[in-house]
């Protein structure tokens, strides 16, 4: 059985479920429950502070975020995914085709989930000074909370741009905030992550695997600086991770997506899920309650023989180097990322047929064929019948070392070091189970910076496609002017860089437009 933080369940009775609107009442009836604990009465020792910190992780693995809607929102805002067929729900299809509205429930769930994370982090940070029995643990828990708050604001600013910033628990409507400029949000992100990196440990024992580490904070700092196009600053954080020697690439690329190989040497931060043995799912969406031990819907949603709501896009599939297009070798990562009709699954005991797969076909090198996701879907060990209902506990690898090497390659190229950029790219290609020819190649020359930009775009899609990176890659490269034609066919400049602010936020937060920034993003 897995042993780590998600085995600890805490009923967050007193935590706000988000940024709430308070209402007044004229009655003077005293309804106080003498057994009810407030934050002031609860936080008396480090065990209670740790329980509150665990509640943040519980929200992270809830359906609003990593268990369901987070991966959908990222993937549907990219060009690596396509609709599996008519079974893709309307709210998800709207995002895929660029028809998002302020009432879209997928988008709103992610917004609410991120602010729920922020609220829970603020509870921990605000009440930590009351805890005096174990200062070193207290400070580490505050570091974990700041890491998670920094991550949440990074997600918010990436999707919505200017957003309200809260660094304390909201107790009345007068504390609502207007939208802060993107630079201010990034400053909040960087401040939190720097504080976290200063106190978080490099590793944990098995009982605490899944908690934020120094390496995770450094990786997020690098990401934040990259999105601001500050590649020198980003490079310094990635260099520290590389120099630490804490991480290395797994020999087997597919080990990054299997349940049996979680927390391997490549993993820097994972969102933890639990296989409860009954294929049940917590549809509560907030990670609370008696069923808070959380499985993930990823394998159910993307599995070729389950719901198959999404499939790999033709753009993604045809990005891989292949002998049919003149490459000296077909990239093995294609076979380790997707299932094609005719492939075997269930430990080689079953063969995937077209009629097992509901919905659309793909076009790979001119051939029309049904293809589905292999990453995270667990079909490698499941029979066809078992895969019909598959809510399991496969952890999501939010940060892995290959990303750090590819990030470093981009930073080196952007700061004029083409040779170093190629070195980091080739480290990724030299993984023993991949073993692709080193750059430059005949198909991918490296005579100048823009040649290497093309290599980076290609290699990031091959290595990280379907892992929720591409959305931010597109945002970054679009801002740098690197696209002759935008990867998203619906893209309208001045509108589709950002998602619409949820209508519930506009209706419930009267301060949203009180500053210099309009309450809604342009075009919505």
Predicted segment positions?
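Bacterial N-terminal signal peptides
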Residues: 11-21
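Long, intrinsically disordered, low-complexity segments
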Residues: 25, 57, 65, 81-88, ...
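Conserved, well-structured interaction surfaces
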Residues: 46, 50-54, 58-64, 87-160, ...
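An aromatic- and glycine-enriched ligand-binding surface/loop that stacks and positions planar moieties
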Residues: 26-87, 194-195, 211-360, 484
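Flexible, polar/acidic helix-loop-strand segments at domain edges
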Residues: 94-98, 321-401
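Structural register within alpha-helical repeat arrays
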Residues: 142, 149, 214, 221, ...
